[in-house]
């Protein structure tokens, strides 16, 4: 059964709530961050999170932690099945947890530690969050050998759009596209300074 409940208004340091989170995204108390051999120690914490998800009927075995300034600020285990949320991968849950704790969606200078190489969605989430460093243990081939499709997704995304087979991608031209572009342009025009094209 999917978990439901009212959204939570987290209050960031210094003031006003910025993000709305749902209860299932709140993780357990943060573990102690050791001072020596950070990468290995933080990876072990990520793997410990993955062990929380060993029930094959309700979980998928992945875990992650986010570290900023040498401290763990976000933890996550895979919650896709229990939350009925296809985006609730361990890395995304950890990023959400970090954002809630810090009161910001930008985690610049942070490191994400994952028990396994992130899927394309989670890798992109790291980009959006401004994560500076990604450290993982098992890789996409290890995941594939144990029944997880990450490698297939990476191969699919490497193909030109017209050659992809996992879903149909349709870019509609004409008036509909123009209407959508107008919204993008209106947002850019409303920004306080010039918007730099990301081409």
Spans of features found by a protein language model:
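Short, flexible loop/turn motifs enriched in small residues
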Residues: 57-61
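Short beta-strand scaffold segments in enzyme catalytic cores
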Residues: 62-67
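A short, polar/charged loop-to-alpha-helix boundary motif
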Residues: 80-93, 97
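Zinc-dependent deaminase
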Residues: 2, 9-55, 127-199
């Amino acid at each position: 059964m999917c978990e439901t409940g009212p959204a939570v208004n987290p209050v960031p340091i210094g003031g006003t709530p910025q993000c709305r989170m749902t209860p299932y995204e709140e993780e357990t108390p943060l573990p102690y961050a050791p001072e020596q051999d950070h990468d290995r120690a933080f990876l072990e914490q990520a793997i410990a999170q993955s062990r929380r998800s060993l029930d094959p009927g309700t979980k998928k075995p992945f875990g992650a932690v986010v570290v900023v300034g040498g401290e763990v600020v976000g933890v996550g285990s895979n919650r896709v099945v229990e939350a009925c949320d296809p985006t609730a991968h361990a890395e995304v849950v950890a990023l959400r947890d970090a954002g809630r704790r810090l009161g910001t969606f930008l985690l610049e200078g942070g490191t994400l530690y994952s028990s396994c190489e992130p899927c394309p969605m989670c890798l992109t989430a790291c980009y959006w969050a401004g994560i500076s460093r990604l450290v993982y243990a098992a890789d996409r081939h290890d995941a594939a050998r144990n029944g997880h499709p990450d490698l297939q997704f990476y191969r699919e995304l490497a193909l030109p759009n017209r050659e992809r087979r996992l879903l149909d991608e349709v870019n509609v031209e004409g008036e509909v596209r123009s209407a959508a572009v107008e919204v993008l342009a209106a947002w850019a025009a409303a920004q306080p300074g010039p918007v730099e094209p990301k081409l």
